[in-house]
Amino acid sequence: MIAHKHITKIIAVVMAVAVCLCFCAVAFSRQIKAAAGDTGISMEYETALFDTDSVISVNILMDDADWNAMLENSTAEEYYQCDVEIHGTTFYRVGIRPKGNTSLTSIASDPTTDRYSFKLEFDHYVDGQSCFGLDKLILNNNYADATNMKEALIYDMYQYLGADASLYNYAKISVNGEYWGVYLALEAVEDSFMLRNYGAQSGKLYKPDSMNIGDGKDFGDFNADDMDFGNMTPPDTQGNANQANSSAPSQTPDTVDRPQNRDSSGETSAEPSTDSGERPSMDFNFAGGRGGFSMSGGGADLNYTDDELDSYETIWDGEVTSTKKSDHKRVVTALKNISEGNDLETYMDIDNLLRYMAVHVFSVNEDSLSGMMAHNYYLYESGGKLNLIPWDYNLALGGMGGSSGATSVVNDAIDNAFSGTNFFDTLMEDETYHSQYYTYLQQLVSEYIDGGGFDAFYERVRSQIDELVKTDPTAFYSYDEYLTAADTL
């Protein structure tokens, strides 16, 4: 009888402890997951740099000779040493270099401008140095965008849907105290980004780029000399998009309403104005014509071909984190199972990919997997599961070309937008995932565009950058051209 009483007490104590443990697990689940590396970690730079309520101030302190040498040798993309002041805090011995792809080449060949985009790598010369926890800050020059808002808008939409994407803010750039220009500041997709989004036990990161052709393998007879870079210089400001064949009918479902263009009076119209005051789409001319060439070799298009690791060299060449063959095998295994439609939840971060697809398709960005060039995205793998992280949207909203005018851009197909890859096909063949994708598209239309999200973004940005653009000494456009483009957006 006495033993029975003790057992009853013991059971009661155990149950009480169990209840407390359950409560703690729920109350502190985020902290527990963060410690285990299963979820993101809050970073100081989220507010110190990317609080979009105010523009950040970036003063690059650099020897004039080094600055000029860096600009003159921009295509080498070599790091130089500088100090950087941000909001009154000085970071010493920071690495800086020009960045870009076609934009860098165009600016390098244009004697009238040195307005390059830049990378600031805080730990390049000083191990462990960061900017409020950020390892690398990207400063984009808003090339080929008279509105100065396209890329910021797309990143704002990614944040609105809660997709994994870089934080953004506008930055007033000075060089040795002299105003250089207003840029878009972005969180680089590297270690800090992974820590913020995925926690301490991050996976493997790649940036495949079919433009990095190396010795030409996987690209047949293609030669970079066949590309007409002469037409990649910033075009005129009449908004006349370059024409190309686009005969595929729109696959827009009846349940998703396309946003309509608003004129200056606030009225909506079915057709967007072409008098946008912005540079039209970039005209990329390739030998043999658009229809006969696709830059998608070495696995950059994420299509499964076979089990040979060498078939995916473009992915491995784009490694951001250190990787080995066992990591590569997990990627190929995932691509194979995705192509066969096997256990997609094991091999794809489905919800984030659907959010990525919705914003990316909404952006009509042909300089990407949805165009003819398999680049401008990051591939993230963790535990055999694949995810995509967006990148480079200055040519969004039809700026790349390849459409038959503004009407085609507005009515761009949404079911088969990623024509250059089969990676998303199995998702679209599943009714549940397809429906969720439509839901995210509709959310962008009804909540972000029509529900005030875009208006809030637009009013905030205009109030922040109008005067900075007006006095920008390196701007690609006149202030009047900016006003025309911004008013049309």
Annotate the PLM regions.
Residues M1-L489:
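Phosphate/dinucleotide-binding and metal-coordinating scaffold of catalytic cores
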